[in-house]
Amino acid sequence: MSALGEDRPHPDEVLPGTAFGSGAMFDRIAARYDTLNRILSLGVDRRWRRLAVRALALPPAARVLDLVTGTADVALEVLRQHPDARVLGLDPSLQMLAIGRRKVRRAGHERSAELLFGDAQDLPYADRSFDGVTIAFGIRNVPDRARALAEMARVTKREGRVAILELMEPREGFLAPLARSFVRSLVPRVGALLSGAPEYRYLQRSMAAFPAPDAFAEAMRRAGLEPLETRPLTQGVVCLFVARPGRGAA
């Protein structure tokens, strides 16, 4: 496995068609990523992930694909809730993967979770391969979002589910103005201050640019997914989208 700080992944850890360096921004903030997540979310991010994994309604001995797995928080949550599952995590950031692999080893899940350098837009897996597919706080950063959604629809079993967690600027609700102020002002400033990196300004901009929940659910439909639930969380700062492959999917 690649050690933290290596320039390139071992060939055995790279999926075909993955462009090296596409996770460069996250390479720069990887060392403080988990800490910043806890601080900026006030610790609520753990609950968001628990809800996403529960929404998969996985069968025994499930096979799960976690896209943009990062430091493996979702992969490990799957195994906390379903110890008999097998999880494959893909991410384009070497540094995030290295931290995730250390966490997997510490949790004693080396045989149940495998983390690979890979691209959500081009999955080298057969149709209907996974009981569940997840992506947490990652679809916003995928260049070709429609292609990634179509790939999720393709590799999910007909009876399986897809769970997508994403950050966005709150648009509705009594506390929406306060939540928007937090996202626009405090998130980038606190993130940059604590990390010493400007990437958390990108976080605010990308949240503002992400489609409203209804619009994103429609994008899922166009990509071959049938939305089952759209659930705003924490005053709409996060939304959980749950879907299954559409009836017309191959």
Predicted regions and their residues:
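N-terminal, positively charged/glycine-rich alpha-helical extensions of SAM-dependent methyltransferases
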Residues: M1-R32, F182
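Hydrophobic beta-strand segment of the Class I
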Residues: Y33, V133-T134
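Core SAM-dependent methyltransferase catalytic element
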Residues: A223-E226, P232-A250
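Conserved alpha-helix/loop element of class I SAM-dependent methyltransferases that forms part
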Residues: R32-T35, L42-A61, E77
